[in-house]
Amino acid sequence: MQRSLGRGLRLAALLAAAICLYTGLLLAAYSFPDEWISDNVGAAVGMLTEEGNMVGGYANYFWHTGFSITDNLTDMRIYQGLLRDGRSVTDAAMRTDYARYWHGYAVVLRPLMIVMSIVNIRYLNMMALMALFLVCGWKCRERFGWRTAAHFCGGLLMSFLLIAPFCQQYMPVTFLALAGSAAVLCGWKAARNRLYELFFLLGSLVCFFDFLTFPVLALGYPLACGLLQMVWDGEGPAPIWKKTLLLSVAWVLGYGLTWVAKGIIGTLLTEENVLGDILSQAAFRTTGAFYTDTGAVDVSMRSAVLINLETFFMGANIGAFALMLLVEGVYALRRGRLENWPQALALAAVALWPVIWYCVLQNHSRLHFWMTYKQLSVTVFAGCSALRALGAVREDRSCGEVQKRA
């Protein structure tokens, strides 16, 4: 009891410090004049407008399908919102025009726009994501073997990772998913004793930097990496299941409380009912219909889940996932241990997190399926990792015996 109370106090202190830091950083980011960035912002909006020549004003890359869509409309809103346009620093920092989100990306993007164009920012995005992608793949190969590295990388590629650098809206959650995974994979010895704080902070950072895009990516990938580390360390079913559930709860609390805090801070600083807007949007995104030019579209859990499954598991993705499951299944049958099945089930549970998200946020998941489908890459990685976990103890013991003999 005392241990849980202490952890709760640490998380509360972490949240308070994070909220103060977020608010201060946003105020600082909007403190310098628009003239410093107006030329680059104008050029960015012009480029996004030129690209957005598809139906609905969105831009498609490569395949000209909903699978590969980039949200240029929201990207234009992101770049236009970097300008104060006569607003006070406080109103601009709280984004009174779109107040229900933190818009933490402005802390990075606004200073960068002083010296960089949108083209150079996209190059920077690409280099950052590819560097983290390679680091995570290498560490998976080093720790768990080449098959796990293939599952990690393959799941992300199946979600069209390559398009993320070109869409500023997709960058924060993709970057945080990879950065969180890298923290777990590269710093496991230090992170394993602070996992609750790590996942709580990760959820908070996703809320701060991201719109409501595909947040489960930044929960599922780091969590699956952490659970695999625990399996390889010889942890039993009870601690692994405990971590599966409690780390997920910590992430959700970090995300949810940070979102509520934006409502409180925004309301206090701008004297607008930001909290009311957040609560009404939360209610709208979890239930009800949405409206198009042709009328109302009814939303159900089933329709939200199905449209995301149909978008993700198309063509090559079906074959790639089936091949990964087949290869891992053969290895599990030949070299696995059935007593590992409770640990494997914990990873299989993580594979269901995107589906649970679709059911809870059914309106958002149905309306924005062309980006929320990306969360199913968690299903690919965690599902294959569940089979991988069946053979972990035997392989780990063999490695240990070799090391002792050496």
Task: Locate predicted features.
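Membrane-lumen/periplasm interface segments of specific transmembrane helices
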Residues: 29, 244-328
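Juxtamembrane segments of multi-pass membrane glycosylation machinery
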Residues: 104-125
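Aromatic- and kink-enriched transmembrane "portal" helix at the membrane-lumen/periplasm boundary
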Residues: 107, 153-176, 203-208
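Transmembrane-helix motifs of polytopic, lipid-linked glycan transferases
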Residues: 126-149
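Hydrophobic, aromatic-rich transmembrane alpha-helices
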Residues: 133-137, 314-341
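Transmembrane alpha-helix segments characteristic
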Residues: 151-153, 338-362
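Membrane-interface alpha helices of multi-pass inner-membrane proteins
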Residues: 195-223, 243-257
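Hydrophobic/aromatic-rich transmembrane helices and adjacent perimembrane loops
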Residues: 367-389
